[in-house]
Amino acid sequence: AKTDIPVNIYKPKNPYIGKCLSNEELVREGGTGTVRHLIFDISGGDLRYLEGQSIGIIPPGTDNNGKPHKLRLYSIASTRHGDHVDDKTVSLCVRQLEYKHPETGETVYGVCSTYLCNLEAGADVAITGPVGKEMLLPEDEDATIIMMATGTGIAPFRAFLWRIFKEQHEDYKFKGLAWLFFGIPYSPNILYQQELEELQEEFPENFRLTLAISREQQNPEGGKMYIQDRIKENADQLWELIQKPNTHTYICGLKGMEGGIDEGMSAAAGKFDVDWSDYQKELKKKHRWHVETY
């Protein structure tokens, strides 16, 4: 049975007002930046969602033109049942956006991410959505799920991994392989590290974790170890898996990450005289190559 995909239950004109239950720092000492794990109470409304979807957050106040702020979309980091597995919450993984102003050189902080990162437990939050059909998990319990994330791109994959391994459901018992490639700058930036390591210990046959820690590890050329270097390193095995009809590949994170991944896959496919860009187009047509970058 195809799961009904909920979309836009709450629209920007009439958002759902949830409550912040908790807001915890995910980056440990020695890491860079701030990334928060937020849990919102949604028990009072009709908000439903699936793993791989996003919700919109409308920051309070007005922009420089006196207009209400536009919503920002964030990938959901929890399964449809929420972190407490009681169907009453939704979680986000939010990095505080900061950048240097091109003209003044001042540090500018993102409006919505700063609002969320500083949100206190008990505070109201305006939520819209859910949206997204691109990043949904297949129903097939024997599927191979390849996930490639940088930074907070881990959010949907945390939802996937909880769904696959943590929650045992009568109607969904995963027997396939889930392989996560995760790119971060420093070890303390490994978001959800403890959860990931527990899964590795508990499900060594079904879960693989490959980290690319750019400021601590070196690639074979002596440069920084980025996610695309790990893809290249494992390209032959990935190519073998990707040819299976029930393999799904998901990419989530910063816009620039796709180029390097394509390079690695291109080299592997090339060994078998396959043109990767043609092959990838076919995968996209069959809804087996899923990309969400921002």
Curated annotation (Swiss-Prot):
It is a peripheral membrane protein. It is found in: Cellular thylakoid membrane. GO terms for molecular function: ferredoxin-NADP+ reductase activity. NADP(+) binds at residues 75, 95, 152, 184-185, 214-215, 224-228, 253-254, 292. FAD binds at R72, L73, Y74, S75, C93, V94, R95, Y99, V111, C112, S113, T152. Its main location: membrane. It catalyses: 2 reduced [2Fe-2S]-[ferredoxin] + NADP(+) + H(+) = 2 oxidized [2Fe-2S]-[ferredoxin] + NADPH. Residues 13-137 form the FAD-binding FR-type domain. It comes from the Bacteria. SUPFAM superfamilies: Ferredoxin reductase-like, C-terminal NADP-linked domain, Riboflavin synthase domain-like. Its cofactor is FAD. It is an enzyme of class 1 (oxidoreductase). Keywords: Antenna complex, FAD, Flavoprotein, Membrane, NADP, Oxidoreductase, Phycobilisome, Thylakoid. GO terms for cellular component: phycobilisome; plasma membrane-derived thylakoid membrane. Its EC number is 1.18.1.2. InterPro entries: FAD-bd_FR_type, Flavoprot_Pyr_Nucl_cyt_Rdtase, FNR, FNR_nucleotide-bd, FNR_plant_Cyanobacteria, OxRdtase_FAD/NAD-bd, Riboflavin_synthase-like_b-brl. Belongs to the ferredoxin--NADP reductase type 1 family. This is Ferredoxin--NADP reductase. It comes from Spirulina sp. The lineage of its organism: Bacteria, Bacillati, Cyanobacteriota, Cyanophyceae, Spirulinales. The gene is petH.
